[in-house]
Amino acid sequence: MRLKNILIVVKDIEKSRKFYHDLFGMDLVLDNDGNMILTEGLVLQDEKIWKSFLDRDIVPKSNSCELYFEEQDIELFVEKLERLYPTIEYVNPLMTHSWGQRVIRFYDLDGNLIEVGTPM
């Protein structure tokens, strides 16, 4: 058995597709009416559809998990993030951990936590 995809719930699937394309270069693999699979295995699920499956509330900014990306030129990434999405909500501005890795954490458009760090 292997992990196939990671699914995140989004309010506006088209805005989210653009967000992940703009920042991370993810392209559309499959559009299945409220469910989009992007390259790298990320799945965007329309919130209304997801709620109908689970019959549970969606809790944005729950901070219980994160999407983790690595970027060699993190300063360039931060510049792109600030230019394309100037109102993005940061959890941690660009910082350096005690082990030397530089990271930034922020929420996507729907409160899903994202971390971008330099390669370890």
Question: Which functions belong to the PLM regions below?
Answer:
Residues 8, 29, 93-96:
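Short beta-strand-to-loop elements that line the ligand-binding cleft
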Residues 27-61, 113-118:
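Conserved short beta-strand elements that form part of the metal-binding/catalytic scaffold
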Residues 14-26:
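Amphipathic alpha-helical segments
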Residues 8, 46, 98, 105, ...:
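Short beta->alpha transition motifs characteristic of CBS
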Residues 1-15, 65-67:
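N-terminal beta-strand motif that seeds the catalytic metal site of vicinal oxygen chelate
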Residues 25-30, 87-91:
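Short secondary-structure junctions
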Residues 13, 67-113:
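Vicinal oxygen chelate
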Residues 1-2, 59-64, 97-98:
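Short glycine-enriched loop/turn motifs at secondary-structure junctions
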